[in-house]
Amino acid sequence: MIIGIGSDLIDITRIAKVIDRHGERFLDRIFTETEQARAGRRDKQPNLVAATYAKRFAAKEACSKALGTGIRQGVWWRDMGVVNQRGGRPTMLLTGGARARLDALTPPGMTAQIDLSITDEWPLAQAFVVISAIPAATSGT
């Protein structure tokens, strides 16, 4: 059963400009340490760094929409992090207010599953999030 869907499209150059202007202050406010480490491994190619951050920014926006709150009502940027499963498939790891909202949306006896798709084609990055409730006994995440 689908309990939330969200999508977001962002201009990668917008994220690059914000990073240039605000640097670590912006990165620390929006991105988890795991996300920053992943982008840091691409530091030899500035366009890849910006695209990496833009995809994760779009994923957070899409996730907040799937949660039905946007970035408010106790759901903050760093409560949502893009992590990779074995094999590289991205998903969202929720903490704090985002986790509380997810738990509130998930019906009793069910487990939430978050499916994430992220992509980029310069100068755009895009993310889709689908949150499903699946029977607890068959949950994969």
Swiss-Prot record:
Residues in the signal sequence: none
Keywords of this entry: Cytoplasm, Fatty acid biosynthesis, Fatty acid metabolism, Lipid biosynthesis, Lipid metabolism, Magnesium, Metal-binding, Transferase
Cellular-component GO terms for this entry: cytoplasm
Lipid biosynthesis is among the record's keywords: yes
SUPFAM superfamilies reported for this sequence: 4'-phosphopantetheinyl transferase (SSF56214)
Documented EC number(s): 2.7.8.7
Required co-factors: Mg(2+)
One of the Pfam families matching this protein, by short name: ACPS
Domain of life: Bacteria
Compartment annotation: Cytoplasm
Enzyme class, broadest EC rank: transferase
GO molecular-function term, one example from the UniProt record: holo-[acyl-carrier-protein] synthase activity
Catalysed reaction, written as an equation: apo-[ACP] + CoA = holo-[ACP] + adenosine 3',5'-bisphosphate + H(+)
Biological processes annotated in GO: fatty acid biosynthetic process
Binding site for Mg(2+): D8, E61
Key word Lipid biosynthesis present: yes
HAMAP family (alphabetical): AcpS
Family that this chain belongs to: Belongs to the P-Pant transferase superfamily. AcpS family.
Stated role: Transfers the 4'-phosphopantetheine moiety from coenzyme A to a Ser of acyl-carrier-protein.
Protein name listed in UniProt: Holo-[acyl-carrier-protein] synthase
Organism: Rhodopseudomonas palustris (strain HaA2)
Gene: acpS
